[in-house]
């Protein structure tokens, strides 16, 4: 009976043959005390079948040591229920082997608590598969330590959806490496919020390809800081569509230096609003190509300030 099983001295548990353990039913497994479970040898643990493992209570599971858990096969680990995975201590989760982590189903991964995710180190984060990353909730993603963000494989980042991208904190976005950033597709980039975009450094933005830069929405372009706009590479500026160029704020245009102004194409100049044209620093007027000036309409010409007109060169 269950009472008889609980009466077995913990010191004698190791003497139980694996075939005898296998003969126990779920109710009998659950009847074992935590001290008895803790006394099981790794040989006994590795002999347990899926039904035996699934019979373990949360309290019983939590007494298993790192060596106990790591002695289990990936098939055994994959047999745990979502409730059991959810019940593991942060200390247990932190010391799981990569193979065990990868054996978790998407349902098991989604059952991980945010406290368990926080306990993961970079090796644990790096071990997760693309399918597992795609299954993570927004709360779980936000729980990843910023110091571990660089460990995420580019394929895993590519598996994330727009809502997941928007869930990242600015500190996490700031922790992305240039290799990770250059791997992002158009949908990933367009999912970034204004706050997330504004934490990208000059090197981050300049690491993006012109195709990636051209993928930003007009709202995202308008959200860039003046410092970010000021330090854009000429190729990125030229990659802007006319709609994106028209989305630039007057503060961003005012922050442009002569090299930035010179980088604008005739099509982009023709798309600028009168307010944007008036925002160009008079000191940068000389950098405007004659072909760009030729693309301007009458209304745009009339928008120039007298100081800007005075800055035009004779050529």
List the predicted regions and their residue ranges.
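General marker for long, soluble alpha-helical cores
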Residues: 1-315
